[in-house]
Curated annotation (Swiss-Prot):
Part of the 50S ribosomal subunit; part of the 5S rRNA/L5/L18/L25 subcomplex. Contacts the 5S and 23S rRNAs. This is Large ribosomal subunit protein uL18. One of its GO terms (cellular component) is cytosolic large ribosomal subunit. GO terms for molecular function: 5S rRNA binding; structural constituent of ribosome. Keywords: Ribonucleoprotein, Ribosomal protein, RNA-binding, rRNA-binding. Gene3D superfamilies: 3.30.420.100. The keyword Ribonucleoprotein applies. InterPro entries: Ribosomal_uL18_bac-type, Ribosomal_uL18_bac/euk. The keyword rRNA-binding applies. Pfam families: Ribosomal_L18p (PF00861). Coiled coil: none annotated. It comes from Orientia tsutsugamushi (strain Boryong) (Rickettsia tsutsugamushi). GO terms for biological process: translation.
Length: 124
């Protein structure tokens, strides 16, 4: 039986393969990282097979979100705010469509809230 870390890596590789197959590299991807305390998201444009360029980024450590609370911010409320902030920053750079890269995380809870917040101004 595989442990949770192995299952996470398998899910992550499966999601990345689907993104590469479906988008064909023509859309930037919205990548998500979650820790126990914070959540981070960035819009990445893949230039080649080994090169990538970050277009916009947002996290719970940003000044707009950080001033509201001093405690843990990896919850649904803050994840939605991070998604909205990232969508605003991507729109200011001219990005309207992205592919959602949830990594190895299940599409549930915080990850879903971030996607819903970003979906208000971006097309998936």
């Amino acid at each position: 039986m595989r442990d949770s870390k192995d299952r996470f890596i398998i899910r992550k590789n499966r999601v990345r393969a689907k993104i590469a197959k479906l988008s064909g590299g023509c859309y930037p991807r919205l990548s998500v990282f979650k820790s126990n305390r914070h959540i981070y998201a960035q819009v990445i444009e893949n230039i080649g097979s080994n090169k990538s360029n970050t277009i916009a980024a947002a996290s719970t450590l940003d000044k707009d979100i950080f001033t509201e609370s001093k405690y843990y911010k990896c919850n649904i409320q803050y994840a939605k705010k991070v998604g909205q902030l990232l969508a605003e920053r991507a729109n200011s750079k001219g990005i309207t469509s992205v592919v959602f890269d949830r990594g190895g995380y299940k599409y549930h809870g915080v990850i879903k809230a971030l996607a819903d917040g970003a979906r208000e101004k971006l097309n998936f």
